[in-house]
């Protein structure tokens, strides 16, 4: 097995005159297919880090059952998945071919996404294949970047990090020159035509009634059913990202440019985070609208906390998260329970479940065993996913999957891909859903989808004014 060894070369610069957004605007044309990850965590800025990844040098992808790996020496390998060579085996084989040492080796890893469609490789789920030529993005895609720009909000500094191979010249000065350039260009964004959906309101309500019937029959306790919206546009979708991050600051803000398509959003929910052998899941279950008025929001929060349907649903999904982690962890417990968290258009109830990885546990397998989130599928998870594939008119693509970082050291941080746009060929896809139980009301569930999409729709309007 060939290996690629790197040492992290770095430069620390004052960060008080540079924001992640302005820096990204400076470097994106010089370094195509770059990415931006930000955090806007209301718990405090001491742990906030933002990242820009530049110059893809290696990638791991899975599509239609074929694993494709591309390496820094431009070599390329393709291999089909088999019962003896599954996704976690392929991923670990890929990651083992990289060695990173140095001061910032902990940031050595791959950045990318796992679509909801990838469940076909983990469970017996008949995911609908897409016949849409515009929907040819890999089901799983993670990329290793040559350069990282790391922003430390608390210390007001940024660090330029380069993966430097043996006997390889450094080009970190070129990145520094681009960052220190005071000039950058922004471009307009304009929505064209009306927002459409692949389901009418009545068709989605019909699907909700199907979900309620399955719950009443005992097929599932809960099922998450979603609908997709489509908006044509002209101009620069990064301007839309800027609007979204302004309207809906979240723990996970991201803009991934993959060349032919982009994925960007503002997710509130941690799917799975592993750091120093500790794994956490932050299930969100229970949502109500946010009015913007302090007294009204307090009353809405109290009503949400007292709602027996929402309480039962939340408890069930916390138990599901605990069971998922227990497959590879011990000392699994709930750190906090039903904490109200406030976002631009909604109020969520959030819990945190954590556990310590077993001695022989593999982080990639631990992540896969929690995928997808119960909050985006239902319970029991496998049966819910089978029904989702049957009821929803198309596969979900990125929606409901994960996006984030997987480290060479075993750490990972994955957000659930919600409150997210997929952009391709001047067309935006965005999607939202809600958890259906036996006592659900179809009109309330329809409104919950609209509440969750409120930030995205408002961002489209704001982006046209930037």
Report each predicted region and the residues it spans.
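Extended alpha-helical targeting/anchoring segments
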Residues: 1-466
